[in-house]
Amino acid sequence: MASLSLVLRYVVFLSFFILQKPKETFSSRLQRSHAKVAQIGADDYPSSGRNTPVHDLGFPDFPSFQEAVAPPPPPPDLPLLAPPLPDVPLLPPPAFPDFEKPRLPVPVWPSLPEYPPFPFVDQSAPYQGFAPRFDESANWMPSTPSIPQVFPCLRFKSNLLRVEFWVSSGTAVKGKDRFCNRPSKLDPNPVDLKTVRLPSKFRLKKLLCRVESSEVCFGDGNEKDTNPSEIDLDSLPFDLKMVILTRLSAKSLTNFKRVSKMWSSIIGSQRFIDSFFTMSSKQSRCPKFPVNTRFVGYDPIDDQQKALSVSVPSRKRNLEHKVLTLGGGGQGWRHIEVTNAPFSPVTVGVSIDGFVYYGAYSPTPPMNPVLVCFDVRSEKISFIKAPNDVLQWGFDLWILEDVERHEWSKQTCVFPSSVAWDYVGDIQMSFPGTNKAGIGDDEEFRRCSGFVDEGECHVRIAPQHVESIARFKDPIMSRILM
């Protein structure tokens, strides 16, 4: 009786529960499914536009019924970085008799192997240069297990940036797997770097951007985010280091040897010493300064004194003639034009009856001597030819014929007027007490140079001096020279 009473009570309770709960129809289940999907999109992307990806699955946000039936907006004029997705067909809204409002249509997307999802491409947004719309609060491309994802691989070639997309296996990137050596699922799209504005920094927490040789790929989060503007000098090629160091001065190279052992070995190597010597020999070590000669003349008619300045910037250029009137009321130097061939002054000027005369010669062959005449009043220059046999240079050359017998022979050399002084490039060299060939009497030379009774004067000219970093084996001489 007790067991029968318990069974009857259970049957009565179950019957009462079944009678009180309404039966769920197919329409109610479908309505609940649609409401759940819409709530997911509204919670995750409250402010997103149309066709914004949800959970990297490709589900778009749900527009209103008027937006669904409205014609799509025209495509932008600029090309998209990634190929656009095909138009998604929308099913007509089903008729639900127990619904007050029609429910939103459910989009039908293509299968995943044929068209992989693009979690970072916004098809409705205007062209932004680089594909993704970045989320400032989280990863725009998270590594979620069991969800296939797309990873870009950027390749540089000239001024073009090639963007290729690779589909991962649905797991996070581990180690140094770059996805850059796998076959492409989509056709690459060349982008001109001059017109595309790339983001200065990728906002990724787990995936960072790294430069490896000629490719820019996405690496793992264990790599350091370095500044691309900083260049490691040790990573430069050896030949490039040699070129940079050869353009420094010898004093700077001496200090740079203390930077590292590698730099010290490079600077001290014979190959670098030869390269530095070759580079230094090509540079001019003898600067050219303009030679200025000034003459003062007097004009008895106008009772004025004027100064003539002749500047010789180079032998291959015309001379610069300037005139200054002394006491002329603040007038400065004035240029005067000389149409004749340039003649360089070689003698001291003499002022006679309103004219200034000085000896000169032509700097170009045949280098004829002339007498320059400057009219102080009219400020004009004229030339008077001089006889060629007036200016002659020569010297005696002693030649040692026999070393054992100490026999010498003498030769007298006479230069014609076409031969001028001893030249060092474009610079003339002469010394007091010597003739035009640089040879003179020892007593006269010592008297003009200040050596009257004691000592000798030795003049050493090294016009071909070239700076070098070669060192002597003697450490004392090395310290003195360096």
UniProtKB/Swiss-Prot annotation:
Residues 230-280 form the F-box domain. Pfam families: F-box (PF00646), FBA_3 (PF08268). Signal peptide: none annotated. PROSITE patterns: FBOX (PS50181). InterPro entries: F-box-assoc_dom_typ3 (IPR013187), F-box-assoc_interact_dom (IPR017451), F-box-like_dom_sf (IPR036047), F-box_dom (IPR001810). It comes from the Eukaryota. PANTHER family: BNAA05G37150D PROTEIN-RELATED, F-BOX DOMAIN-CONTAINING PROTEIN. This is Probable F-box protein At1g30780.
